[in-house]
Amino acid sequence: MTEHLDPTLPAPGAPADTPTSTTAGAVPGPEAPENTAGGRPRVAHPWRWLLAGVALGILAFIAAATIPVPKVIEGPGRTWNVLGTVQSDGQSTDLINVSGAQTYDAQGALRMTTVSVSGCPGYPVTALDVIHAWFDPDEVVLDRDQVCPRDVTAEQQHEVEQAQMTSSQDTAVTAALMETGQADSMILTVKGTSEERGDGVFKAGDVIRSITPAGGQTTTPSTYAQLQELMTTIAPGTEVQVVVSRDGQDTSLTMTTLEPGKDSGRQGSLLGVMLDVRANSDVNATFSLSDVGGPSAGSMFALGIIDKTTPGDLTGGKDIAGTGTISSDGTIGPIGGISQKMAGASDAGSQYFLAPASNCADVVGHEPKGMEVYAVSNLHEAVQAVEGIAAGDTSSLTTCQAVTTR
């Protein structure tokens, strides 16, 4: 009997997992890919996922680089040498123009400093800008509402900053002339009244001559500081007689004094007027500087006027920067962004910086490499600091480190 073997079964003696024959047309080899429903093989394309990831990354980058975010970035701003010149209407002109007094040339620099601010209305920043600022030690990122409230337009903010700049310039003139003895008194002119005082008593343009409280002595304040000191001695609700010069004639006004706001920290009472305070002098100064706002250059403006109107070179040829508000009595007050201002001054080449003593906590640890920073509380101290730097003897000057460790 002839034995017929099933060709699909292994031959005798062959391993069970070794094929001994193939069906017609079949090719031995790897397992064929699974077919799709349509009969075509399903093939994976990993490069498609790569392209999708790249596209999403590009879209994310574009969004980060173009969509504004509610942040403000403060960084080092420009500096101006107040003893130098600026371009105005295509011509070079002195930044400070003094009239009514002899002026003297200066060889050094007294730099006013600024902060560059981005993120307020009209100057948006993006997430990419913010990320860059996080890694820049000279920049700081703040919430927008801390710097520019949403209900204030760019135009309104500009107007406020320009008014602050103008006021600081006027006050700098008064402080400088009083410091140098070119004026020995001030003119106190009413420019407005508070809501509590209302209209009908003072008029804009009234010049305050004297104040007499009921049952008290008459005082003729010759400076704003004297007026402030007098008002601290008069209780709220006291009837006073105020003599003003109105249209060239003395006019007597009777009123009761007002109570200061609970959070004002002031003692005594108020007249309820806003004053324009100017030095009683024929000397005056104007400023050729546009597109810069805020009150923080007052101290440097005052130093510039002093250098221009006194013999010799106050700076001794040194490059000195600084910042600080100024009051008519010469008090130098705190400002914002002092770290950025020091960095900007260093970038401009200044080796010395005058900082308000009230800002020293923000100065220590942020001084640029190679820069000497000195604390000043008033204009007289600032003049002494510049003179010490010019003479090469700063041993008597106060550092911010010394202020913070008192």
Feature names for model-found ranges:
Residues 166-221, 331-336, 348, 357:
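PDZ/PDZ-like domain segments forming the peptide/carboxylate-binding groove
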Residues 48-68:
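Hydrophobic membrane-insertion alpha-helices, especially the h-region
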Residues 73-106, 113-119, 123, 134-194, ...:
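PDZ/PDZ-like peptide-tail recognition elements
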Residues 1-47, 138-142, 151:
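Terminal targeting segments of Actinobacterial cell-envelope proteins
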Residues 355-366:
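Short, glycine/polar-rich helix-capping loops at beta-to-alpha or helix-loop-helix junctions
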Residues 177, 205-208, 242, 273, ...:
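Terminal peptide-recognition signature
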Residues 228-270, 365-391, 396-404:
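PDZ-domain C-terminal substructure recognizer with occasional recognition of PDZ-binding tails
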Residues 308, 328-353:
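Glycine- and Gly-Pro-enriched alpha-helical subdomains that act as flexible
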